[in-house]
Amino acid sequence: MSKGFTLEKNLPHQKAGVDAVMNVFVSATPHLTDNVAVRLLANPELKLSEQQYYNNIKNVQAFNGIAHSKDNHNAKSNIIDVSMETGTGKTYTYIKTIFDLNKSFGINKFIIIVPTLSIKAGTVNFLKSDALKEHFRDDYKRELRTYVVESQKNAGKNTKSYMPQAIHDFVEASNFNKKYIHVLVINSGMINSKSLTDTYDTGLLDNQFNTPVDALRAVKPFIIIDEPHRFPTGKKTWENIEKFNAQYIIRYGATFSEGYKNLVYRLTAVDAFNDDLVKGIDAYIEDIVGDGNANLKFVKSDGKEATFELNENNNKKSFKLAKGESLSKTHSAIHDLTLDALNKSTAVLSNGIELKIGSSINPYSYDQTLADNMMRKAVKEHFKLEKELLTQRPRIKPLTLFFIDDIEGYRDGNDISGSLKTKFEEYVLAEANELLKTEQDAFYKNYLEKTVTNISSVHGGYFSKDNSDKDDKIEQEINEILHDKELLLSLDNPRRFIFSKWTLREGWDNPNVFQICKLRSSGSTTSKLQEVGRGLRLPVNEYMCRVKDRNFTLKYYVDFTEKDFVDSLVKEVNESSFKERVPSKFTQELKEQIMAQYPELSSRALMNELFNDEIIDDNDNFKDSDAYSRLKSKYPAAFPIGVKPGKIKKATDGKRRTKMRVGKFSELKELWDLINQKAVIEYKINSESEFLSIFKSFMLEETERFTKSGVHTRIDKIYIHNDMAMSKSIVSDDDDFAKLNTMSYREFLDNLSQTIFVKHGTLHKVFCDIKDTINITEYLNIQTIRKIKSGFSKYLLNNSFNKFSLGYNLISGSIHPTKFTNADGNPLGEVLSSDLGVLQDNAKAPLDTYLFEEVFYDSELERRNITDREIQSVVVFSKIPKNSIKIPVAGGYTYSPDFAYVVKTAEGDYLNFIIETKNVDSKDSLRLEEKRKIEHAQALFNQISQSVKVEFRTQFANDDIYQLIKSALP
C-alpha cells in the first residue's frame, strides 16, 4: 500500500490554469521594499504598468477563449479569477501557481483563505503531505512551510498578550533561506476574529507593528481565496480581507456568485464531464407511490408559537407548535423532527431547514420507511460495487457518504432497537453474510469476515458538534475522515461508510466516494454541482494512483422531493458553460469532427464548400471573426451544445445498448472463441546473466532519471545595485552535497524487489557492477524506486524483439461469459453501445455483413470500415468491444485490436483477420511503444495460427480495408 497519493504532473487542464495566471505577469519586475526592517521578511513588489496589466489579461483571455468584456474584465482590480469545476484539482493548480510565482519572481509569502474548518483541514493536510513535498521537490528545489491560524484561548487579565503564533512565525520568517515558501492558512471565522485586530504587548517586524493585520499587510502578501462564492464583496469578511492590502488576490472556485473581476481561465462543468475528468452521475430517486401529495405549510408565528397548516387529500388542518415540540404532532409520517427556533418570520427545524412564512415541507419525506429504503438500497448497491472493485487488480476501495439529520440515532444508537445505527448495521451484516456464502476471492472474503466480526469498524461520522467531543473513538473517526485520506482508503481499514449532517456538504471530498445518500433533504440553496462535488473526483487504486482508463459513476440517492434533481443539475451544468474557444485555423480535427456527422461529404468537397463560402482562405485560416460561427451554423450536428447525453442521468434511464444480428454470430464464433483465449506472455530470457545484462543496460542508460537523496547548499548573495538591495544565487559544486538517505540499502532492495518482482540478489549484483557509473546508495529513496519501475516497464516494451524475444502460452479453459456471449457461450441479444464506440452515425446503415444493427465508432477510419463498400468475400465482421481482449505486452501493459473479420475465399476456405486501425499516414508516424505493441499482437496471432489461421494487419488512414484484406488472400 502506498503511503501517499501519487500526484500527476502537467495534466493539461491544470497546467492551463497555472499558465493563465503566470501570463498575467508577463513583463512584471520584482522590487524590494525600502524598509530595511522588512526587506528580507516581505515579498518583493511586482511592478506592472496599467497598460501592460490590461494587455496581459486581454491576451490571456483571447488565448483561453474568454470574451474580453466588462463581465470578465476590470483593469482597476487586482483580483484574478480562475474558474475550475469541482473535482478537477483546483487546489493542486493554485499550489503549483505558488511554486511558479516563487520561481519567476521570488514571491515567498502567500495567504490561503478558506471558508470552513473542514476545507481548512483538507487544505493543510495536502500542503503538509509528503506526496506534495516529493512531487515538487525535483522541479523547484523548494518546500512549502505551512502556518495554520487557530483560535486562541483568552489570556488572563494580568497575563502578557502574545500575537497568534502562526502569524508571528509567518511574518517573521526570513526570505533569506530560499529553500522555503511560506504559506499561511486561515479560515473565514478567524479572518473576522478580534485576534487579528487586537493590539498585543509584543510587536512584529522590529516592533513596528502591534496588530496582526498591520504586520500581514507589511509583508505584501499574495492572497489565494478558495471557494469565492463564500466570500461576497461588501460583507464583513471581504472587508477584513481587503485590510491585508494584498498585491494580488487570486480566486479559485467552481462558483462565482457575484461574477468575475478578471477571469483568465475557466474549466467548465461541461468540459469536466465531457473530457472524463470527473465521474458521471446516476441519481437514485426514492418515489412515493400513492398518498405522497401532502403539504405542511408554515402559515404564521407570534414568536412564541408557530401555526402550521396540513393540506392532504384536500382536507386542511391547523396545528400550533411551541419551540422544542415535535412535528410528528402534525403528521404521523414525520419522525425525528422538532421546532428548534422561532421568531415572527422564521421557523428553524432540527434538521437545519429554515422555513419562512408561506414555505412548506412534504411530511412523507420524513417517513421512516422512505429513509430505511434509501439506506438499504445504498448499502446493497455499495456491496455490489465493492465486490467488483475489490476483486479486480489493482483494487479500488469504494466509499459511501450518508447525509443524515438524526445525529442522536447514529451517535447514541448502540443496541437501541430501531435506531438509525442499529438498522444500518443490520443491513450491512445481511449483505456481507450473503456475499460470504459464495465469495471465492481470498482477499475480499477476508475483508467481509472482518466486517462481520467488528461491524462498528465499517462506519464513522463527522458532525459539527464533534469538535468539542473528547471521545477517543470519535476523534479517530474524525481524523480519518478529515485528515487522513490515505488511512481511510487503506485496504487494511474496513471503514467505508461515512455519516455526516451537512458539515461535509462543501469543501470536503474524497476521490473514492462512489455513492452519496441524502436521507433527508438539506433545505439548502447550495448548488447541485457543489453537493455532488463530494464524490466527483476520479478514484485512486490501492497504490494511490488515479484511475483514468475507464468510466466511473457517482450514485446519488435523493427522495421524491428532489425528483427534478437530474434536470436541475443538467441545467446548472450547461448554464455554467461559457463562450467556447474560437480557433483561428480550420484544423484536421475539425475536419474529422464534421465528416463524422456528415459522412456523405468527401474531404475535398468539404474544403471546397468552406472556401467558396469564404469561411477559410487558401491556408485554411478562418477569414474573419464570424467565420467559425458560420461554420457551426452550416454543420450544426458536428457542434453539439452542452454536456454529452448519458453523462448525468437517472439510474432508471439505463445504459444505451445496440442490437446484435444474432444470426451472424455463428459465423464469427470460432474466431471470437480463439481471440478470447487467455494468454500469458513469456519473456524468452534464457539465463540470469542475460537478464542481468538487460537490467544493467537499463540502469546505465537511465542514469539521468534518478534524484540523489541529500542536502545541497545554495548560497544567496545580497548586493546593492542602484541604491536597491538585490540578491543572486550561486550554485555550489557537487562537493557541497551531503547525502541524506530516507531508507537503508536493505529497505531499498526490499521495496524495489517487491515493486518490480526482481530478486534481491539480482538487484544487488547489478548495483555492484555499475557502482563506478552510478552509486545507488546516493539514490535510496521512494522516488528512485518509482522511476525504476516506470522506466524499466517502458524499457522492456521498447526493447522487446530487440534485446530479447517473446512468446505466448495459451491457457485452456472456459472463456465465457464474454462481451458477446453469456455464461453458456450463447450470443447476447444486445451489447453496450459504448463498448463499440463513443460516436454514432445515424445517417448511414452498417454493411449487411456487420454484426450489429447500428453504427458506433471511435474514428472516421472505423466508420468507413463499418458503412462503406461491401466486400463480397467477407462473411461477417465486427468491432472488437473495448477492454474485451487484452493482449499482454512486455512491461506489464496490454493492447486491444479493433476489428475481427471472417472471409471466405473463392476456393471455399475460411480465413480469419484481426485488424488494428491507426488514424495516421503510415507506420513511421507511430510512436515506438505503439510499434512494439503491434509486434506483440503479431506474435500472439502467429501462436494462435498454429491451430487456426488468423491474419493480423494494421490499417492506416489511407488504407482501404478491401485492398488490405485482398492483399492477404492466397
From Swiss-Prot:
Name of the top EC class for this enzyme: hydrolase
Span list, region Helicase-like domain: 75-540
Segments for region (Endonuclease domain): 894-918
Matches recorded under InterPro entries: Helicase/UvrB_N, P-loop_NTPase, RE_endonuc_C
UniProt keyword terms in alphabetical order: ATP-binding, DNA-binding, Endonuclease, Helicase, Hydrolase, Nuclease, Nucleotide-binding, Plasmid, Restriction system, S-adenosyl-L-methionine
Domain of life of the native organism: Bacteria
Protein's name according to its UniProt entry: Type III restriction-modification enzyme EcoP15I Res subunit
Entry binding sites for AMP: T91, G122, F126, D226
Cofactors that this protein relies on: Mg(2+); S-adenosyl-L-methionine
Recorded catalytic activity of this chain's protein: Endonucleolytic cleavage of DNA to give specific double-stranded fragments with terminal 5'-phosphates
Keyword Coiled coil: no
UniProt keyword Protein biosynthesis present: no
Pfam families: RE_endonuc, ResIII
This enzyme's EC code(s): 3.1.21.5
Written domain comment of the UniProt record: Has a helicase-type domain in its N-terminus and an endonuclease-type domain in its C-terminus. AMP lies in a cleft in the helicase domain.
GO biological process: DNA restriction-modification system
Self-association state and partner proteins as the record states: A heterotetramer with stoichiometry Res(2)Mod(2). A heterotrimer with stoichiometry Res(1)Mod(2).
UniProt GO molecular function: ATP binding; DNA binding; helicase activity; type III site-specific deoxyribonuclease activity
Function recorded in the entry: A type III restriction enzyme that recognizes 2 inversely oriented double-stranded sequences 5'-CAGCAG-3' and cleaves DNA 25-27 base pairs downstream of one site. DNA restriction requires both the Res and Mod subunits. DNA topology affects its action; relaxed and negatively supercoiled DNA are digested but positively supercoiled DNA is not a good substrate. Interacts with DNA approximately one half-turn downstream of the recognition site.
Family to which the UniProt record says this protein belongs: Belongs to the type III restriction-modification system Res protein family.
